[in-house]
Every structure is written in C-alpha cells, then in structure tokens.
Amino acid sequence: EDTESLHTITVEYRSPSSDWSTTDLSTLWHNSATSRWETNFTPPTTAELGEYDIRIQVDDTDEDSSGWSTYSDVLEVLNNGPLVTSYTPSETELYRTTSIRLQAGVSDTEDSASSMSITLQYRSESGDWATDYLSTSYFNSSSGRWESNFTPASTAELGDYDIRLSVTDTDSSTSTWYT
C-alpha cells in the first residue's frame, strides 16, 4: 500500500454553533520523526468560545477513503484573561481631604482598554479593603488609562495605605489583584 506521506489528509473543525471549516488551520504536514500528520489551530481573537469538534479523513493514491472520523469536544477555545499592566499614583503622600489621582494601565487580547472595567480598593494599616475614599473609575481616552481619585476623609487613619486593583473584560474574566 501507500507510504504515510503519500496519503491525502483532510482535517476540519467545528465551533459550538457553526459548520465545518479549515479557516484557522495551518497547512497539514507529515512529521516523519513522529510518523504523524500535523496542523496548527490558531483561532482569531473573535473566535467563538467553547468546545470544538475535529474530523479527519484519509484518502490514498488509489482514491480509497477512510470516510470521516469525528472527535467531539476535543479543543476548547478560551477567553484570554485581562491584565493590569501598570499602576501609578500622582503622588505618594497626601493630606486628609486632599486628592491624588490613581492611574491604571490594562490590556486584553480581545478587548480594548476602554471596553473593560476596573475595581479599585484601598486599606489602611489596620483596616479592611474598602472603596469609600475612591471616586468612580473612568477611562481617560487621552492617557489610554483608567483613573480614579483617592480622597481620604478628615477622620482617615494616618499612615500607609495599600491600593489594589483588578480588571474585568467583556467576557467577564477578571485578572488577579494587582497590589
């Protein structure tokens, strides 16, 4: 019969709600070191999330065919999680009832920074995480960063404060806390 490298292999995939396709597959090649056919699946950032099916068909030089062999839910396309890329306070010291601006840079493979949202919290040396002294966060399109004002009350505890933030993308994936 035919040597493996002479077979014609067809590989297709199917997302949870579409038809069979080859669009996001690389050209197939025969890996002689492992004696198998290989392809790369590279879904775009707009690819549907979920489990994908794969089907394979082998044809030989005599035009005989194996027919389709289908494998269900063998690939899972996941959302890339968002990241906090930077955090910058406008000042590192302030007085009670005065404000400093907190800026945060965020990124995500699928979403623009402006389409995401951030969660900011602070705590004093003896306190719990809170948000009372923070203004509503907003995206500053001029700087390309998220911003909020930190304004401690006249009764705020003196000392150092920790600030932490996370970012949530449009698929509801949330980064780890950045402190």
PLM-predicted stretches and their roles:
Residues 1-3, 15, 60-62, 104-111, ...:
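Extracellular acidic, Ser/Thr/Pro-rich low-complexity tracts
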Residues 21-33, 130-141:
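Solvent-exposed serine/threonine-rich low-complexity stretches and specific carbohydrate-binding patches
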Residues 31-41, 140-150:
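Aromatic sugar-binding surface patches on proteins
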Residues 82-83:
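Proline-centered linker/hinge motifs at extracellular inter-domain junctions
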Residues 92-98:
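Short, solvent-exposed loop/linker segments at the N-terminal edge
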